[in-house]
Regions:
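Conserved phosphate-binding/catalytic loop of the ribokinase/pfkB sugar-kinase fold
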Residues: 59, 85-86, 96-134, 139
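Glycine/charged-rich beta-loop-alpha catalytic/anionic-binding loops adjacent to active sites
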Residues: 25-34, 238-246
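Positively charged, low-complexity intrinsically disordered leader regions
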Residues: 1-25
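Short beta-strand scaffold segments in enzyme catalytic cores
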Residues: 48, 93-97, 106, 228-232
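Substrate-binding N-lobe of the ribokinase-like
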Residues: 4-5, 29-93, 306-310
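Surface-exposed amphipathic alpha-helices with a cationic face
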Residues: 51, 147-155, 213
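Conserved phosphate/ATP/ADP-binding segment of small-molecule kinases
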Residues: 155-238
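Conserved phosphate-binding/catalytic region of the ribokinase-like
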Residues: 1, 202-311
Length: 311
């Protein structure tokens, strides 16, 4: 189990509206409720998922000067000493529509202060990375900042976990970043954009994993929504961890919760990956039953109860 995890990534203010279903171009739909604001961003979601599973979490992120950190990041175990403030940009924004029909979402992001983070900003927080068992990053800050954070991690023997989302428009990631990544955790769509191999069955997931192994990554996790998650290590160990079957209300932050919660149970040598993934799946099953991003992320005791009830 990890003792300290650093999350390098985004903070957004989520503006969420429910719709009966997703419309088509030119169509107008009534919404059953007003727009709801909540804290989110893939980075902060993952950080909160780690913190709520009772592990110290260093949050390296950048927000606008207007952001009230004490209020908006008031989460036990979440260390906000590494939050930075942009002089020129406001806090990032995410505009989220959630289908009441399926619980699925569509998200549009304005980067704001997330895009203002620099490699110098990251390097200034080397101490946070050095004390960690894992560094987790996503792609809502610049590619350069993620590479810098992973360089620091590797310089200090810290394992790196990459959630390659949102994927760049060209569908590619720098070879340098892949080579600095110990664990990559895309979903089925993201891995298709990276590898060109569509996920249709376990054999195709193995083919996807081979692509990453050739580029220096030792451990691959591919999430496939309600079907669960596939894993494979370079030593040949592989399998599928099924999801917990629940009725989804809102899938926002489901993947972030899985990654953050899973990482808290991982041993630094990754020898308990399936067990850690099952913990992450249990946490994610709670998230999808609730509305919103950060508000939906469960506490450790809730996750442990799900595991106990599903032995």
């Amino acid at each position: 189990m990890a003792k300290v995890i650093t999350v390098l990534g985004s903070t957004n203010i989520d503006k969420v509206v429910s719709v009966p279903r997703f419309g088509v171009s030119g169509e107008t739909l009534h919404t059953p409720n007003h727009q709801v604001e909540a804290m989110g961003g893939k980075g902060l979601n993952q950080g909160v998922a780690v913190a709520r599973s009772a592990v110290k979490t260093n949050m390296i992120t950048k927000v606008g000067k207007e952001f009230d950190t004490a209020k908006n990041m008031n989460v036990a175990n979440l260390n906000t000493e590494h939050v930075m403030y942009s002089e020129t940009e406001e806090t990032g924004q995410a505009y989220i529509t959630v289908s009441e029909e399926t619980g699925d979402n569509i998200i549009y992001i304005y980067g704001g202060a997330n895009a203002d983070m620099t490699t110098e900003d990251v390097r200034a927080h080397t101490d946070a990375i050095k004390e960690s068992d894992f560094v987790i990053a996503q792609l809502e800050t610049s590619m350069e900042t993620v590479i810098e954070g992973f360089k620091i991690a590797h310089e200090n023997g810290v394992k790196t976990i990459l959630n390659p989302a949102p994927m760049p428009e060209d569908g590619g990631l720098p070879a340098e970043l892949l080579n600095l990544t110990d664990v990559i955790a895309p979903n089925e769509h993201e891995t298709f954009l990276l590898t060109g191999i569509e996920v249709t069955d376990e054999h195709s997931m193995i083919d996807n994993a081979a692509y990453y192994f050739e580029r220096g990554i030792d451990t691959v996790i591919i999430t496939v929504g309600s079907e669960g998650a596939f894993y494979m290590r370079k030593d040949g160990a592989e399998g599928i961890v099924p999801s917990f079957k629940v009725k989804a209300v809102d899938t926002t932050a489901a993947g972030d919760t899985f990654i953050g919660a899973m990482s808290t149970r991982l041993n630094p040598n990754l020898d308990n990956l399936p067990e850690a993934m099952r913990y992450g799946a249990a946490a994610s099953s709670l998230t999808v039953q609730r509305a919103g991003a950060q508000p939906s992320i469960p506490m450790e005791e809730e996750v442990l109860k799900v595991l106990e009830d599903n032995k």
